[in-house]
């Protein structure tokens, strides 16, 4: 196993520098190599969701590719879909460095990146230049508002991103749950969320009828606020719920020297909380829209827990950082074994299984 040795070397370097090195390498993977190296798909894991076909449930969460568009390299790792972003209308540098920290004892990351990206125009140019063959699966684009945009004007930022980027996206995600943009999470409140999502859904429907628009929620909402957000999102026409973003909680890492740093926590400490949020969202949605489970997907067991809790798809980022290039292949192989163990013919049969077997009581 070469990855543990390489990881120990890379973890001696600044986390953001390693991120850029990884992106540089992935950007240079030829399409032919990506196709050849991509793990073989497993028929039982195929998913059809929101009118799109996924050759497996495991996608790359937003935050890794912020518009550099290293799609062949990322798909070559085995991801069934890649979510680019978060992208804002105008370029912005994000928060001051250092802003990304590893907590290796806990298999976690803590970040306060702040939507650093080169803006929607740069992202659109790169996606437009990409050959169609480079899309080895669905591509999502996660959009947000610029830091300097007040919340009362936030809708204009989201609409601008949808307008510019929708031709290149198989689906779009409205990100209102990052803890690293001041005031952003206030957009999850009932009236603000309703106004924003209705405007976004209408705008996209006028330009690309049938193209899915999802909303990404925080794991730190109260049970009542989460139920309300799911209801509002569905009533506004959202095609799905992405649950969840990073957490402000430090449960499980309280004694770590980095615990006092500002930012959102991801990785293994988030796994149970995020799965509980998936479970509650699934119960509240009652089959009306799919749930995409994100947060603490570090292995097949974690992915399977979210699927049984109600996630049709799952996404990972921190799991890739700790698991290395073979991460997705291991998760998919493990999922296939777990499905067989529990008597499921397909992954879709396992979605929400805990609810049907009496284990789906909503958290809270």
Curated annotation (Swiss-Prot):
One of its GO terms (molecular function) is dihydroorotate dehydrogenase (quinone) activity. The keyword Zinc does not apply. Substrate binds at residues 66, 111-115, 175, 180, 245-246. InterPro entries: Aldolase_TIM (IPR013785), DHO_dehydrogenase (IPR050074), Dihydroorotate_DH_2 (IPR005719), Dihydroorotate_DH_cat (IPR005720), Dihydroorotate_DH_CS (IPR001295). GO terms for biological process: 'de novo' pyrimidine nucleobase biosynthetic process; 'de novo' UMP biosynthetic process. SUPFAM superfamilies: FMN-linked oxidoreductases. Its main location: membrane. Keywords: Cell membrane, Flavoprotein, FMN, Membrane, Oxidoreductase, Pyrimidine biosynthesis. Its cofactor is FMN. Belongs to the dihydroorotate dehydrogenase family. Type 2 subfamily. This is Dihydroorotate dehydrogenase (quinone). It comes from Anaeromyxobacter dehalogenans (strain 2CP-1 / ATCC BAA-258). The lineage of its organism: Bacteria, Pseudomonadati, Myxococcota, Myxococcia, Myxococcales.
């Amino acid at each position: 196993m070469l990855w543990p040795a390489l990881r120990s070397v890379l973890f001696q370097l600044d986390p953001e520098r390693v991120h850029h090195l990884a992106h540089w390498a992935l950007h240079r993977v030829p399409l032919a190599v990506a196709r050849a190296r991509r793990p073989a798909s497993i028929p039982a894991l195929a998913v059809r969701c929101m009118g799109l076909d996924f050759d497996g449930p495991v996608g790359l969460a937003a935050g890794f590719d912020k518009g550099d568009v290293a799609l062949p390299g990322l798909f070559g790792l085995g991801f069934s879909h890649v979510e680019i972003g978060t992208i804002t209308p105008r370029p912005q540098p994000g928060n001051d460095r250092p802003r990304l920290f590893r907590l290796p004892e806990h298999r976690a990351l803590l970040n306060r990146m702040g939507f650093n990206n080169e803006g929607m125009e740069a992202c659109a140019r790169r996606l437009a230049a990409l050959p169609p063959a480079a899309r080895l699966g669905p591509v999502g684009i996660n959009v947000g508002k610029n830091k300097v945009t007040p919340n009362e004007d936030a809708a204009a930022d989201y609409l601008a991103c949808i307008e510019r980027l929708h031709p290149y996206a198989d689906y779009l995600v409205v990100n209102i749950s990052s803890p690293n943009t001041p005031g952003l999470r206030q957009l999850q409140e009932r009236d603000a969320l309703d106004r924003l999502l209705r405007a976004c859904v209408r705008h996209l429907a006028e330009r690309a009828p049938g193209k899915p628009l999802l909303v990404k929620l925080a794991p730190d909402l109260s049970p009542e606020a989460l139920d309300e957000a799911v209801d509002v999102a569905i009533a506004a026409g959202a095609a799905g719920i992405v649950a969840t973003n990073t957490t402000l909680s430090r449960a499980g890492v309280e004694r770590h020297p980095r615990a006092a740093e500002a930012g959102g926590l991801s990785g293994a400490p988030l796994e149970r909380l995020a799965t509980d949020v998936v479970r509650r969202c699934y119960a509240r949605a009652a089959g009306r829209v799919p749930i995409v489970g994100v947060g603490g997907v570090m292995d097949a067991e974690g992915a399977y827990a979210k699927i049984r809790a109600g996630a049709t798809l799952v996404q990972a980022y921190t799991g890739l950082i700790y698991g290395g290039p073979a991460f997705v292949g291991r998760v998919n192989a493990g999922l296939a074994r777990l499905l067989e163990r529990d008597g499921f013919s397909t992954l879709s049969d396992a979605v929400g299984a805990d609810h049907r077997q009496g284990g789906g009581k909503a958290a809270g």
